[in-house]
Each structure stands twice: as structure tokens, then as C-alpha cells.
Design a protein with these regions (language model features):
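Soluble extracytoplasmic regions of secretory-pathway and membrane proteins
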Residues: 1-238
Length: 238
């Protein structure tokens, strides 16, 4: 990604690439996308009227990166200050919402958006949280819209974070046969492996991770695939 903007002196001197790339499916192809960010407070101060001019799109198969210049620059971003800060902008609009994160994506036409899942407490005893909706923010205009989980547009790829998916499966794997069994005996208790990956199927991003026994985690006993937009999970035995 850095190479893609390296030849653009006016860009590389004022902005840096957000290293937290988002895995997306763009017209059926696996891609990674990241916005540019201001390289510090003074870079923001000097460029705040111009905004952020574009983003970087990486082909995950060919390992080729392209810089995409926008017709309308990005105003609201994580590296912005004061009223240009994305989190501050969302807090003003949704003061009671609990945001899980802010994920940069583009739709099928290449228009940029931040996907911002909202959370609610589901398990009081354990302090568990789960996604209950999504706010989609246009970072160029600041326009935001809140969606319930069954209303999320098809082009959105990431509503459920991989870490949250692993946590949710571990709740299921440990507690399916009861809380007492999860502490004493741990019969049939399962947990996910320490890492996860992404796969694009039918223009959706799926998160996959291995599953092991709590008692013996030396080998996988199966794996689980979860749709990162809908949360639909499928378990496969090995």
C-alpha cells in the first residue's frame, strides 16, 4: 500500500496509510482496503480544509495495491481532531450507543463508508456483549444511518469482528452442556484456536477458525465458519 502512494509526493508527505486493513469482498473478489490518515496533529491542521483525498485498495490474490483518488475527500476519520474526528462525530449523533469498532469499507461502486457495529449487554452474569445493529457513516459528508441486523445492506462485509466471533463460539463451546460442566469435568467442552482467517464466498466475507477440545488442544477436532455480515455459523467436523 505504501508503494502505491509513494510516487505521489503531495500525498505521501502529508498522509499515512492506516495499517488496519479491512478484508472485503468487492464484486466477488477478495480485497483489502485502508483509508489514508493524517500524519499527526499539524498535518491535520494544515490539510483539514482539503480532507483526505483517497484510500488504498489491495488485491489479496495478486498482491497489487492501487491508490484510489476520491472526487469528494474524506472529512471524518479516526485521525481527525475535534469535529473532524470520526468517533466524536458519531458520539454527537448517537450519544447512548456502544460502538464495537469503526471499520473502513467501500461499496460495489468504490464509495467509502465506515461500518460501526453497535453493542448491547447480553449475558449479565459474565459481562458479555453482542452486536445489536450497525451505523453506516459516509466519511465524506458525515451522513449516518442506523440499521437493525436484518436491514444491513448486502455490500457490507464486516459486522461481526473475528475476536467477537471467537468469544461467542467459546461461550457456546464451554456452556452448551451447562455452567457446572464447564467447571467440573468439562465433558464435550470445545474452544477455538488462537487465530482465524478470512475467505470470500459468493461475495460475502467468512471468518474461519479451528476448534479444539478444552481438555486436549493438541489437534483440531473441527472448524467453524461464520458470515462476517450476518453472523450465520456453520460447524464442520474433521
Amino acid at each position: 500500500g505504501q508503494r502505491a502512494i509513494g510516487a505521489l509526493s503531495d500525498v505521501v508527505s502529508q498522509y499515512q496509510i492506516n495499517e488496519d486493513y479491512s478484508q472485503i469482498a468487492l464484486n466477488g473478489e477478495p480485497m483489502k482496503v485502508a483509508t489514508l490518515e493524517y500524519a499527526g496533529f499539524f498535518k491535520w491542521f494544515n490539510n483539514r480544509k482539503n480532507g483526505i483525498p483517497g484510500y488504498v485498495l489491495v488485491d489479496a490474490v495478486k498482491f497489487e495495491a492501487d491508490y484510489v483518488k476520491l472526487d469528494k475527500p474524506i472529512k471524518y476519520t479516526e485521525s481527525g481532531w475535534f469535529n473532524d474526528n470520526l468517533e466524536r462525530h458519531l458520539r454527537f449523533k448517537y450519544p447512548t450507543a456502544i460502538f464495537e469498532g469503526y471499520y473502513f469499507e467501500v461499496d460495489e461502486e468504490g464509495n467509502p463508508y465506515y461500518i460501526c457495529p453497535t453493542m448491547t449487554a447480553k449475558i449479565g452474569l459474565f459481562g458479555g456483549y453482542d452486536v445489536n445493529g450497525v451505523v453506516i457513516c459516509n466519511p465524506c459528508t458525515g451522513e449516518c444511518k442506523k440499521y437493525s441486523l436484518d436491514e444491513v445492506p448486502q455490500w457490507v462485509d464486516r459486522v461481526y469482528d473475528g475476536d467477537l466471533i471467537e468469544t461467542k463460539y467459546n461461550w457456546h463451546g464451554m456452556l452448551a452442556d451447562g455452567f457446572i460442566n464447564s467447571i467440573i469435568g468439562q465433558k464435550d467442552c470445545k474452544k477455538t484456536t488462537a487465530d482465524y482467517g478470512y475467505k470470500v464466498i459468493d461475495n460475502d466475507v467468512w471468518i474461519y477458525t479451528g476448534v479444539t477440545s478444552v481438555i486436549d488442544d493438541s489437534s483440531n477436532i473441527g472448524f467453524v465458519m461464520v458470515n462476517a455480515r450476518t453472523g450465520k455459523a456453520t460447524y464442520f467436523n474433521v
